[in-house]
């Protein structure tokens, strides 16, 4: 009797150990530091389909907290508390096809924001609505993402869609509110030749934000400024113009060369251009400013995923931002003639880095 029980117990123990080993291997494959080397290429959905050999679904909750005694950037406030829940999945349908998805929900607070009454400051600055009072804001965000990739002979094909919705508001005066919707679609293709995946992807992006500030107290209101640059404003339309609408978007081109054996030189090039249009929404619609952003991100390096993982790569990130102000004539009823356009804001940013990885 003991002998009969021993054999099933031994088989169960071996099965549990094999299952645990397989699960550990899967988690390691999806979370290893080496993936950071391949992350730029995975922006192309065709290459993302080759990211992993195994399937994995993960659920996790996190909280990001920061507190400053003095704000480093006034428009971003003195800190935040942003808890979030995430769900991620990557499923291999076969040796030649994969699907993936991501969903997240964030709901938290941002503290002591001043001189900024507009959501997505990093995206839209300096063309924001601002006041000198400010305060804490509540922030809510939804993100959904899904993609599919397949391989047909030497060809890799993939598509991906991302949607982001955000809601930022303050429930005391000045009661700012920003409602954001953003949709991004990527299409990618790659070809296998000479030991490399040669890939290209195209991205289209559409962005909208409704932005306004209200006052409920009877003690009066504070002026809202239509910011146009570093400490500059569009004085004519500052003060009581507190309802704005932003719309815009842009395009990206991604080019990649990835060695099939994970050993050799590789490169990534990201070219992008975006435009964001600001208009006043009162009893009329008045175009006010246009913000332009052109960017180049390039990565070139060498890597070897052998017994020891080694990589050395250089990154160059360049962005050119400029802002146009529309010169508006005297109104006739609710019509404002446009007399001209002046470029009154320019800002160039360049970041470079050299990274080595060994493990």
Where are these regions (language model features)?
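N-terminal, post-signal peptide beta-strand-biased segments of exported outer-membrane/organellar beta-barrel
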Residues: 20-111
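Outer-envelope beta-barrel architecture signal
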Residues: 53-59, 95-101, 153-159, 194-200, ...
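Residues that define the transmembrane beta-barrel architecture of outer-membrane proteins
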Residues: 55, 79-85, 138-144, 174-185, ...
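Transmembrane beta-strands of outer-membrane beta-barrel pores
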Residues: 61-69, 105-109, 152-154, 163-167, ...
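Outer-membrane beta-barrel translocator domains and adjoining extracellular loop/strand segments
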Residues: 69-76, 112-118, 169-177, 211-218, ...
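Residues on the lipid-exposed face of transmembrane beta-strands in outer-membrane beta-barrel proteins
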Residues: 85-91, 144-150, 185-191, 253-259, ...
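Surface-exposed loop/turn segments flanking beta-strands in extracellular/periplasmic regions
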Residues: 113-130, 219-236, 333-340
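Surface-exposed extracellular loop regions of Gram-negative outer-membrane beta-barrel proteins
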Residues: 147-171, 180-183, 268-281
């Amino acid at each position: 009797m003991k002998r009969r029980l021993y054999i099933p117990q031994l088989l169960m123990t071996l099965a549990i150990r094999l299952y645990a080993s397989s699960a550990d291997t899967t988690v390691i494959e999806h979370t290893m530091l080496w993936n950071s080397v391949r992350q730029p290429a995975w922006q192309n959905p065709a290459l993302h389909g080759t990211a992993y050999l195994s399937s994995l679904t993960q659920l996790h909750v996190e909280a990001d907290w920061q507190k400053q005694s003095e704000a480093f950037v006034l428009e971003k406030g003195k800190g935040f508390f942003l808890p979030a829940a995430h769900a991620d999945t990557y499923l291999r349908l076969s040796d030649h096809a994969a699907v993936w998805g991501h969903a997240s929900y964030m709901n938290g607070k941002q503290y002591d924001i001043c001189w900024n009454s507009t959501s997505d400051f990093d995206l839209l600055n300096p063309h924001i609505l601002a006041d000198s009072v400010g305060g804490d804001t509540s922030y809510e965000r939804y993100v959904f993402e899904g993609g599919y990739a397949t391989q047909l002979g030497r060809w890799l094909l993939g598509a991906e869609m991302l949607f982001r919705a955000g809601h930022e508001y303050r429930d005391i005066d000045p009661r700012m509110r920003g409602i954001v919707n953003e949709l991004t679609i990527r299409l990618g293709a790659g070809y296998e030749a000479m030991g490399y995946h040669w890939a290209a992807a195209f991205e289209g992006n559409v962005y909208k934000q409704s932005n306004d500030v209200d006052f409920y107290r009877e003690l009066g209101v504070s002026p809202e400024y239509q910011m146009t640059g570093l400490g500059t404003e569009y004085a004519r339309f500052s003060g009581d113009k507190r309802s704005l609408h932003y719309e815009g978007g842009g395009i990206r081109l991604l080019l990649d060369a990835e060695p099939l054996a994970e050993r050799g030189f590789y490169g990534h090039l990201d070219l992008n251009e975006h435009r964001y249009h600001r208009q006043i929404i009162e009893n009329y619609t008045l175009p006010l400013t246009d913000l332009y952003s052109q960017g180049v991100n390039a990565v070139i390096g060498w890597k070897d995923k052998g017994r020891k993982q080694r990589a050395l790569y250089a990154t160059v990130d360049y962005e050119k931002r400029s802002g146009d102000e529309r010169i508006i004539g005297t109104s006739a009823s609710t019509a404002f003639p446009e007399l001209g356009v002046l470029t009154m804001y320019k800002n160039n940013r360049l970041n470079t880095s050299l990274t080595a990885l060994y493990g």
